[in-house]
Amino acid sequence: MSKTTIIERIWPAKEIIEDLSELRKQSPLTHVITNIVVTNWTANVLLAIGSSPAMVIAKEEAGEFAKIASGLLINIGTVTSNDAITMKIAAEAAHQAKIPWVLDPVAVGALGFRTELAKELLNFKPTVIRGNASEILALAGTDGGGKGVDSTALSSDALPLAQMLAEKTGAVIAISGEIDYVTNGKETISISGGDPIMTKVTGVGCSLGGVIASFLGVQKDPLRATASASAVFAIAGTRSAKISKGSGSFAVNFLDQLNLLSTEK
């Protein structure tokens, strides 16, 4: 059971509209260090919401660039030894420069190298940690029961430990699932929506980390920024699924729906 009251936030709540409007106005420069499977898709998703993505991954440049970005995403999905160096450099630079950053610990707990890397990255105080229930449970120190990048646990199952992890790390924890939960340990927001077909298009979940990083660049309250990003993602998924014949048309429609979301009151 959750130890805090859960507040539901869905599109078109006032806070979400305001945050998306501000994002489109500012077009925040978002530094993305992500896995090779989803790089192109993530860039297109960020462009669709109005952000300015930059995929700077050279270890010689990552620290310098992280300091001038509005937000940073580090996703360890296809991490290599060289990638790990880049990630630690960027995370440290963002931490020193007080740039908000998101850690997406893909498949943490399933494999040793990435699990140790994720724990090292926690030293640089991520603003937000986003993952599925199994990943969050594993990062919190329990057996998440995941199978690679997929979760075998419900997001609600992970919520109590997510709240503890938030208090321990100081990060906002975002758990993706049939219902998304966002918590700072004291406050918890639920976001419903989306569609199961979102799990059938590679990169959809990973790109949410970039969307959160973009919202962090314009909304200084990380709990609110993460909830707004998740709600925008959910409504675009819901609307796209209704007009799609399958995963191929969904991918195109999802980008369109992100782009077409109206912030007019």
Curated annotation (Swiss-Prot):
Protein keywords: ATP-binding, Kinase, Magnesium, Metal-binding, Nucleotide-binding, Thiamine biosynthesis, Transferase
Q: Where does ATP bind?
A: R130, S176
InterPro entries hit by this protein = Hyethyz_kinase, Ribokinase-like
Q: Which GO terms describe its molecular function?
A: ATP binding; hydroxyethylthiazole kinase activity; magnesium ion binding
Record: residues binding substrate:
M55, G203
User: So, what pathway does this thing act in?
Assistant: Cofactor biosynthesis; thiamine diphosphate biosynthesis; 4-methyl-5-(2-phosphoethyl)-thiazole from 5-(2-hydroxyethyl)-4-methylthiazole: step 1/1
Q: Which cofactor does it need?
A: Mg(2+)
User: What's this chain's function?
Assistant: Catalyzes the phosphorylation of the hydroxyl group of 4-methyl-5-beta-hydroxyethylthiazole (THZ).
Name this protein carries in UniProt = Hydroxyethylthiazole kinase
